[in-house]
Amino acid sequence: MNKKNSIWLLVAVWTLVSCGTVKSTREKPAVALAQSSLTPEQQRKYDYFFLEAMRLKEKKDYASAFGLLQHCLDIHPNAASALYEVSQYYMFLRQVPQGQEALEKAVANAPDNYWYSQGLASLYQQQNELDKAVTLLEQMVVRFPAKQDPLFNLLDLYGRQEKYDEVIS
């Protein structure tokens, strides 16, 4: 990238960061979340098995922890916490399609969780799915106005895709 483009990119970043207070006055889009239809007994079981899975993970008993997470998903198929943890296991096992699917479901079921969204955006970038990464990062910039990482990642992707008009707008 030549010096002129670098200067324009720096000016654009500075402008967007300095306008961060304007973004906070925008209304947040309404996100329809599936209400948990678990009975108190089912919720208690889910919590128990999830915490037990985390305990086993900490003890490095990964196979047992993964089995308990699968049981958690049998109890509550849309539980974002279990979906996220399962996605991490799939990624470790290099089963990226299954990991990506689980992570996408986790983000869909917990859209206000910054870390789930950040993980999915990073995965999209690693998989060279830049359009999906841009779409998610654009949503994150609106949803998490106090976080600057999504904004910088978005500007980087715009630069790589040579979408200079998007950087300025």
Q: What are these regions, as identified by a protein language model?
A:
Residues H71-C72, K105-A106, Q139-M140:
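Canonical positions in the second alpha-helix
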Residues Q42-I75, F92:
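Alpha-helical segment of the N-proximal tetratricopeptide repeat
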Residues E58-K59, F92-L93, Q126, R160-Q161:
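Register position in tetratricopeptide repeats
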